[in-house]
Swiss-Prot record:
PANTHER family: SPERMIDINE SYNTHASE, SPERMIDINE/SPERMINE SYNTHASE. It comes from Acetivibrio thermocellus (strain ATCC 27405 / DSM 1237 / JCM 9322 / NBRC 103400 / NCIMB 10682 / NRRL B-4536 / VPI 7372) (Clostridium thermocellum). Belongs to the spermidine/spermine synthase family. Pathway: Amine and polyamine biosynthesis; spermidine biosynthesis; spermidine from putrescine: step 1/1. InterPro entries: PABS (IPR030374), PABS_CS (IPR030373), SAM-dependent_MTases_sf (IPR029063), Spermi_synthase (IPR001045), Spermidine_synt_N (IPR035246), Spermidine_synt_N_sf (IPR037163). Residues 2-235 form the PABS domain. This is Polyamine aminopropyltransferase. Homodimer or homotetramer.
């Protein structure tokens, strides 16, 4: 008998994958957590039935959420990831020689533990000597740390449940205060095809706090519509002015200097969202 998994991404849209088996399933303190083996995308991490990452396409998301702000900043030494318990963003951050410390703040301990067990290629840097893992509320952590980080990455789930507060202007204010005077933050901000109002609001909120606000995009097959965006708020450095010729060669599959520049070139319909 064939087994198929379907994520209903909207009331009228979904993605369906043929599965081999369920490797893990549990109800944590915060959410339903599962890892399944799929034919097309390999192992897939699910939270409340929503695809978070897969071994086949995770590199796109993690490289773009991490390297764009890190190479925009002139000398990032300390970075924070809020969410991202699978460890993919941390893996990319520690590829940068300038990084002296990377902090992961994940509210659900079991996401970290299960990722280490079933997704070692993604979570492989969580035990790196430069990495500190904090199990706790990311909003609380950010509010308790002022003027501390060069780069903050909001690697959150969708804006429902435990992650809802990570999309609020009060949180963005706390992020601003948590950053150093030349700091940069990036948040994943969903699909411009189906989350237009959310993106417009986030851009407006971030613009009210940061002198430089940019939207950039990439293609992620397993995320809703396959077209995803990130919002950057920067106190000093403009990613459009990054000297891409000076970006060193690092081990990536998607990100490159040309992609760094091209990701900010938006189709007309997406430009309308950020006016």
């Amino acid at each position: 008998m064939e087994l198929w998994f379907t994520e209903y991404q909207t009331p009228t849209l979904g993605i369906t994958c043929k599965t081999k088996k369920t490797l893990h399933s549990e109800k944590t303190e915060y959410q339903e957590l599962a890892v399944i083996e799929t034919e097309q995308f390999g192992r897939m991490l699910l939270l409340d039935g929503i695809i978070q990452t897969t071994v086949a396409d995770e590199f796109v998301y993690h490289e773009m959420i991490a390297h764009v702000p890190l190479f925009t900043h002139k000398n990032p030494k300390k970075a924070l990831v809020v969410g991202g318990g699978d460890g993919g963003s941390i893996r990319e951050i520690v590829k940068h020689p300038s990084i002296e410390k990377a902090v992961l703040c994940e509210i659900d301990r079991r996401v970290i533990e299960v990722s280490k067990e079933y997704l070692p290629e993604i979570s492989c840097a969580l035990d790196n000597e430069k990495v500190e893992v904090v199990v706790g509320d990311g909003i609380k952590y950010v509010k308790e740390h002022k003027n501390e980080f060069d780069v903050i990455i909001i690697d959150s789930t969708d804006p429902i449940g435990p992650a809802e507060g990570l999309f609020a202007i009060d949180f963005y204010r706390a992020v601003y205060d948590c950053l150093k005077e030349d700091g940069i933050f990036v948040a994943q901000t969903e699909s411009p095809f189906i989350d237009k109002e959310l993106i417009t609001r986030i851009i407006r909120d971030v613009k009210s706090l940061f002198p430089i606000t940019r939207l950039y995009t990439c293609a992620i097959p397993t995320y809703p519509t396959g077209y995803w965006c990130f919002t950057m708020g920067s106190k000093k450095y403009d990613p459009l002015e990054t000297d891409i010729d000076s970006i060193p060669d690092i081990d990536t599959k998607y990100y490159c200097p040309q992609i760094h520049r091209a990701a900010f070139i938006l189709p007309k319909f997406a430009k309308e969202l950020i006016k």
